Amino acid sequence: MAKKSNSKKSTPVSTPSKEKKKVIEKKSSTAIPRERVIKAVNELIKFTSKPQDENNEEGNNGKKNLLEDDEEELKKDLQLIVVNNKSFTGTSKSFKLKLLNVKHSFYKPWKEASATAVKDFKVLLILKDSDIKKVSEDDLFDQLDSEGIKVDEIICGKDLKTVYKAYEARNAFISQFSLILADDSIVTSLPKLMGGKAYNKVETTPISIRTHANKEFSLTTLTNNIKKVYMNQLPVKLPRGTTLNVHLGNLEWLRPEEFVDNVELISEQLIKAYQIRSIFIKTNRSPVLPLYYNQDVLDELEAKKDKIEETHEDDMVTIDGVQVHLSTFNKGLMEIANPSELGSIFSKQINNAKKRSSSELEKESSESEAVKKAKS
């Protein structure tokens, strides 16, 4: 008789793991949380959608204000306010625009919107004198029309010296255009040829592009670079100061999520390239909404401020019972001077310190009197 096996059949049983799966929190890959940008853009859309006061909309006779359309368009212009820790360009003045990458074209919707605007969206191309006959508007039309891009006029440096040499003629011609592209080999000579007025606006400041490959003019290189600027880049004018305005276009040009994409990408580039302190978003007629601040940069500024204050306190000395601020040179002079003569040597500093003290006391007494009168 066969013995029964005492071993139980090993059947695979799925036992629930006691260990809980760790929930991985998704962190924003950008410096500014996307939700914050979405909320800010939506709030600005709501704000600009509010109707204007009746006094602004209608005149005394009930007719529409002639400037209403312009005001309506202006109040929807979206912009970033970017504050840097120090000057963006230093002491030197730069005529060259900085190009920021964007996910959604800035120029394409601008051109579409210009169909019903006062000013048409037009593109000017400036080439070297030797290249002007190597390409025509028709050649560029064949290469660019599929992308909805049109170069309206092509000129060379010689034209600016002759045809548009007169101040009025030159300014009238340049002001027609919303985008000016120029061969990178001549862009540095254009401020003199175009005049300073052209560089007051971003839209009439020429953007340098490559037109040559292997030291030869190339239609392919030219058209590729035109497409790159038109479809994927946004020009900004870097200021000498610490505050940069980045114009993002009219709120009606793009969908809200497209503006959010562009804001994220632009902010990321600027934060990486500079010591950005803070970033805000607004329209021409709205309050400013905060998007970003860099605590490390703010801490650095605070540390510098504290250091300056400490240095100022260290420079204070007492002469004849008066607290006086002395420069490094005067402190050295004080060390070698006769102590009995310090009052006469630094009489000017002592008198200034006394005046400051008396004015501060007067201010305090006047404030206390004002408080007493308010209480009585």
Curated annotation (Swiss-Prot):
The compartments listed are: Nucleus, Nucleolus
Transmembrane spans? none
**InterPro entries, from UniProt?**
Ribosomal_uL1-like (IPR023674), Ribosomal_uL1/biogenesis (IPR028364)
Annotated GO CC locations: nucleolus; preribosome, large subunit precursor; proteasome complex
Q: Which UniProt keywords apply?
A: Nucleus, Proteasome, Ribosome biogenesis
Q: Which GO terms describe its biological process?
A: maturation of 5.8S rRNA from tricistronic rRNA transcript (SSU-rRNA, 5.8S rRNA, LSU-rRNA); maturation of LSU-rRNA from tricistronic rRNA transcript (SSU-rRNA, 5.8S rRNA, LSU-rRNA); protein catabolic process; ribosomal large subunit biogenesis; rRNA processing
Region: Disordered; residue ranges are: 1-29, 356-376
Ranges where the record places region Required for interaction with CDC4: 310-376
Q: Where is the composition biased (Basic and acidic residues)?
A: 357-376
| Molecular-function GO term, any one | RNA binding
Further comment found in the protein's record: Present with 45900 molecules/cell in log phase SD medium.
Function per UniProt: An adapter protein that specifically links the 26S proteasome to its substrate CDC4 which is one of the substrate recognition subunits of the SCF E3 ubiquitin ligase complex. Required for turnover of cell cycle regulatory proteins CDC4 and GRR1. Required for synthesis and nuclear export of 60S ribosomal subunits. Required for vegetative growth.
Quote the subunit structure annotation.
Interacts with CDC4, PRE4, PRE6, RPT1 and SCL1 as part of the fully assembled 26S proteasome. Interacts with pre-ribosomal particles constituent NOP7.
Its recorded name reads Proteasome-interacting protein CIC1
Q: Which organism is it from?
A: Saccharomyces cerevisiae (strain ATCC 204508 / S288c)
Q: Per UniProt, what is the name of the gene that codes for the protein in this document?
A: CIC1
